[in-house]
């Protein structure tokens, strides 16, 4: 039974503090779609996704209306395409294999537009130890795919705590991101490419979502968003000790998560599929007040990025997890605080005044999910430097047994002090400086950084 105060509190959260369900993502298994014939493969994929996901948008809108809770994005994630291309590309030349992968990606884009979802994720490869031929071709095809599609997101898992870091793949992904930046408008294609360590199989958030090989046939995963709500709570705690702040954030996260699970289960029930997880991640938007940086500043920092930022973020992330885990037994995905620069108005301001630099963002990723996200850098940045930034982030994830990722955008013709405007959820990215010193010799070595001693857990 809800008391009137709780109902009023929820209305306030939605109306004034930007509380919403960021995404309901339908994960779909495509392993049974594999076929030697490319046309049959595409037909199988089309039939499977449209039959299971054709009503996703309509259903999510209906549930949103029923509860009065906005569901901002409706998305689909699929089995990593690298896992189902083997028989299709067997015997083809490299060029033909790349084109076959792109055709599958174009089919995914067509489906996304037909069913009305915002994005479709799963143009992915899992290459933490080595890449198969079809995965190499899929990775090579990513830049071309980004010029021909609007809604397809690509991700590549290049490292895990158990396997170490595949430095060949890290080198290649730096080159792929660089090439994509040069052939898509304002390097927008790079905003749809994520490089992962320890990628979760049930992530509902783009651009890194895919339907993991250990998942069932179809599942709904939900992601919540409530930085504005948390900030409003913290602002009422002036002068209180940090333990009290943590406790109040925990209580707020409980309420947010409970709402996410309610909506996710309802959408799953209506679609006749299983409910998977609710992702506890606090996901910011470019809207004023809907910012992770603003929460940290409300805790007591003059600007996000100053000394103490990592400690405040660690407290926030831990409190959100504790509150969320109490609210739901089905917690998964990334589940932490996102720090995407272009999507967070407070982060953008911190970069502008010189408080927040790439090195500090890297330190922050040690204590939160998911990594260096939506970072715009000068267009002249060499591929080897992009790879080195990725390698650093992969190392943090590997050693700390957590998910880390890089979504970095070298913007042609732009330099430090410039901006690139994407609009919508992707926001505005200030160009951030990178080191002028080279990492090329390290990246050229290739090989695999061995798994750390903490991987030996048996």
Curated annotation (Swiss-Prot):
Pfam families: DUF711
PANTHER family for the chain: UPF0210 PROTEIN MJ1665 (PTHR37560:SF1), UPF0210 PROTEIN SPR0218 (PTHR37560)
Transmembrane domains' residue ranges: none
Protein name, as recorded: UPF0210 protein MMP1427
Record InterPro entries: UPF0210
Matching Gene3D superfamilies: 3.20.70.20
Family matches, as SUPFAM superfamilies: PFL-like glycyl radical enzymes (SSF51998)
């Amino acid at each position: 039974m809800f008391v009137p105060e709780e109902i009023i509190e929820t209305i306030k959260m939605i109306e004034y503090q930007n509380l919403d369900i960021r995404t309901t993502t339908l994960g779909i298994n495509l392993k049974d779609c594999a076929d030697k014939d490319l046309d049959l493969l595409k037909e199988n994929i089309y039939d499977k996704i449209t039959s299971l996901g054709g009503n996703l948008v309509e259903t999510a809108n209906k549930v949103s209306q029923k509860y009065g809770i906005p569901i901002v994005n409706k998305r689909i994630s699929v089995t990593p395409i690298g896992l189902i291309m083997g028989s299709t590309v067997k015997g083809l030349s490299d060029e033909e294999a790349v084109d076959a992968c792109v055709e599958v990606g174009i089919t995914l884009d067509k489906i996304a537009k037909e069913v009305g979802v915002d994005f479709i994720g799963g143009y992915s490869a899992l290459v933490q130890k080595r890449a198969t031929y079809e995965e190499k071709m899929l990775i090579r095809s990513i830049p071309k795919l980004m010029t021909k599609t609007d809604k397809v997101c690509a991700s590549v898992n290049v490292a895990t705590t158990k396997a170490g870091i595949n430095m060949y793949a890290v080198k290649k992904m730096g080159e792929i991101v660089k090439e994509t930046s040069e052939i898509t408008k304002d390097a927008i294609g790079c905003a749809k490419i994520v490089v992962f360590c320890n990628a979760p199989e049930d992530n509902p958030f783009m651009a890194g979502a895919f339907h993991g090989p250990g998942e069932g046939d179809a599942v709904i995963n939900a992601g919540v968003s409530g930085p504005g709500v948390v900030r409003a709570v913290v602002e009422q705690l002036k002068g209180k000790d940090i333990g009290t702040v943590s406790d109040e954030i925990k209580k707020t996260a409980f309420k947010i998560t409970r709402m996410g699970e309610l909506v996710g289960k309802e959408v799953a029930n209506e679609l006749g599929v299983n409910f998977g997880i609710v992702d506890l991640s606090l996901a910011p938007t470019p809207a004023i007040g809907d910012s992770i940086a603003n929460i940290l500043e409300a805790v007591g920092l003059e600007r996000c990025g100053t000394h103490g930022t990592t400690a405040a973020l660690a407290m926030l992330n831990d409190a959100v997890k504790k509150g969320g885990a109490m609210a739901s037994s089905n917690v998964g995905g990334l589940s932490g605080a996102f720090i995407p620069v272009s999507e967070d108005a407070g982060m953008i301001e911190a970069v502008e005044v010189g408080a927040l630099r790439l090195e500090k963002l890297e330190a922050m990723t040690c204590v939160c999910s998911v990594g260096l996200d939506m970072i715009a850098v000068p267009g002249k940045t060499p591929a080897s430097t992009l790879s080195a930034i990725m390698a650093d982030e992969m190392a943090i994830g590997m050693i700390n047994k957590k998910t880390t990722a890089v979504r970095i955008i070298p913007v042609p013709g732009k330099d430090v002090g410039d901006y690139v405007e994407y609009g919508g959820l992707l926001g505005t990215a200030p160009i951030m400086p990178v080191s002028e010193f080279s990492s090329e010799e390290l990246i050229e070595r290739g090989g695999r950084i061995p798994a750390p001693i903490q991987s030996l857990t048996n």
